[in-house]
């Protein structure tokens, strides 16, 4: 296959072809990735007659190389001469669809599915369907698994006799001895059902579905639950009760929690597929059971779906069903022993406010929100605080502040400093949701109180919190509201609080810009250079180094430099050191 020596233009191609045989896997991989270049150079005839047979014969390679090959072949139609020759790509892909490595098989199936659309109906019957049958009847489970993904792409365009054969082959795969094959069939059942005629769905797909849904392996049963969504969408309402619901009821009470989890996970899709009547009679009780399930994973999956499930209930019975059947379960979940369950619920529970309206929210939901705000799990608290806006829209800021704000203030003053820290971290989020006026009235004093907390980590977090608030509300707000209070602390008798002033100025200067920093904050820093406590004085030097780049040169020369030079003569070694460092960094030395 190597190109003739005399033809220089083909030399790189000869190299690439030789590399396909090279012992070094990296070289083989590079060559496979350039396969389209080789094919272009060889032309369509030689690609069909030489390259493809060569590739088909050498499919015993590293998985990485095979994966690249399976991917490349899916885009090869034009390189073999277009749709009339596309069947030439089937032999190498068929071999790849039988290898042991799942990733390679899946990629080969993906490429086969892609090129199936380029076959004419007669080519499908002559070339593609025989391949599907060979794979489906293969000795190794690997080939039978691959076959499952190929039925739905060829079924719609073949004759009714061939369709009947394909349905028979698929039925065999659904009852295969190997669980892996039944699993593959179950995962493709919904997709196959979509391309079948309605009568065949009822007469053939439903029995397969029922069998798979009662398979001895839970991994097969849970995939049947996924298929249930697709199948239910295809059937007319009057057939659902007899054909799908018995199986679905059985799955919702399956002995394996993984199957029940899958039901909970797909619950709102099932709800849309079966419609409002069956939802009311069947799914509401099933949902109650899932919310009370003994397995935490199942309760968490159901909790995630609470809001969406309630939204999808039909309007005439929605409020009644939620209040009488769903809310009692939610109340229990709020104090669940498992934090994943509580967190899942907290992420969606606020969404019930718009559904239930103002009065119900105030009477029934606010007590639950309050309980969650006080939960020991930070995830739960965060999920409530981050969704306050949708409650705010329903009940208004005043009502919200009367009920939830005391709880937030209580947490902000909690004896455990880690709880205080958590609330500080939520503060910018809260401020954004509640707006500037409300913040100034209710929360500003809290934020200032944290700056003088006795725990350093709180003071530090409160400082960076101020910066985030200024980013939200703007520097004019900072100038009017925050800066005066921060500067007032510079005269505090406690030197730790005086130092906090400097730390705040360090971060505020970044967001407030040159003008406010120079006019309002710098004078305080310079004045503090005369503080009796050395710790404060060396922090003045550090602050000047930090805010120096924001100031203009004349200010640096006339105001900052003299103070730093004075500090280099200080009797304290640390003060001297930091003053000298600041002069050097600001190029004033």
From Swiss-Prot:
Residues 47-321 are annotated as: Polyoma small and medium T antigens Binding. Its main location: cytoplasm. Residues 85-239 are annotated as: SV40 small T antigen binding. Residues 400-589 are annotated as: PP2A subunit C binding. Residues 8-399 are annotated as: PP2A subunit B binding. The modification N-acetylalanine is found at residue 2. It is linked to Houge-Janssens syndrome 2: An autosomal dominant disorder characterized by global developmental delay, hypotonia, variably impaired intellectual development, poor speech, and dysmorphic facial features. Some patients may develop seizures. This is Serine/threonine-protein phosphatase 2A 65 kDa regulatory subunit A alpha isoform. The lineage of its organism: Eukaryota, Metazoa, Chordata, Craniata, Vertebrata.
